Amino acid sequence: YDKVSGVLKYSEKTSSGSYGGCVGLKDGRILVNTGQSSGRSYGTHIFFPEGNSWSKSTNEQNYAPNDQPNGSQIAIGADGKAYILCLNLGARISTNETKALVYCYDTKKTTKGQVSTPEWYTAVKGENKQTGYGLGGDGNGGVYVATDKYITAISSTGSVLWATEVAGTAYGVPAIDNEGYIYYNDAEKGSLVKLEPATGKAIASLQLGTELKSSPTISADGTIYVTGMLEGKPTLFAVEGAATGYAANAWSQMGGNPSKSGYMY
């Protein structure tokens, strides 16, 4: 849609629908996760700008074309790398070994009409269920991944640095503050949890309510916002911590920033 007039500019059917992550790049390309049909998945479409319209990659040219994003949230690094969390369907690693994979693609190497090769793909613990899991980036090429039972740190080269098992069930996308600490929601325990970046050790946990089925948001002044349930009512929680802002030059949270614009680089 045109942001001034609201007039529809373009529409296109995606393979098996679309839900979860959608991000825009400053060169006009758009990354859109697809759905799944009859056990078949199509990964992440790349839309290429063509004048006042776009053309999309074929299913075979998509990122992670044979694994399933499953409603996850995409992250983009300042270097143009795209990170996608998938439910493992066995295209590259046996489903007996892992239920979740993280793919890294270099958008700068992606060209229209060509099949893109991932920079790397890495197995992570836990499962990427249909609950909006995803990734945050620290600005140095490292990413933090949420699955149902683990928060995992991955290096810029795809190596797992640490994997922290959550006490209950994680939910949403981790957020990173300007001191590098990582936050996630434990939906089952109703807690906001803070992790130390070097080791993944939990150094703080704040009981807020119940059913924290959301992703934490860190504002420009460092306030952490979380939505959940309290005494049976939908509630917005505001938490003041030690941080004074969100991670600079980083995909610091769901949507990349407090505005959730999905558009930074």
Mark where each language-model region is.
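Extracytoplasmic/lumenal domain signature
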Residues: 1-265
